[in-house]
Amino acid sequence: LKGKFIYYVGPVDPVGDEVVGPAGPTTATRMDKFTRQVLEATGLFGMIGKADRGPAAVEAIKDNKATYLMAVGGAAYLVSKAVREAEVVAFADLGMEAIYKFVVEDMPVSVAVDVNGTSIHATAPKIWQAKIGKIPVVDAAAG
């Protein structure tokens, strides 16, 4: 797994000529308690999921020079179009909970935690508030 990503996903069965059915991200926060162990044991480049990561996970990501990318929740069909190949590599009997190997191209993701441990969930709200505070409020009811 060295140099690869883990994508927290439960893909739906493909229909017709699809490689995989809708493949939206699952919440990564529930994996926080395993993040350090997984990164140190595997040499992963990073993880892909949705939602923010807790302080311990962010620290583990930083310490291992890894990254955490967010895929768009609610856009499972869009994400699935980036999957070029899909192969079940373990636990096929678990269906969508099996372990898959995906080959992806142009997957729509955003960097949520970079190799320096900078989390968009910590930095973005301050930036947004500063920008929103500069937007003039117009009372449409006042005419």
Q: For each predicted feature, which ranges?
A:
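C-terminal binding/interaction regions
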Residues: 81-143
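Feature captures the catalytic cores and cofactor-binding loops of soluble hydro-lyases/lyases
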Residues: 1-107
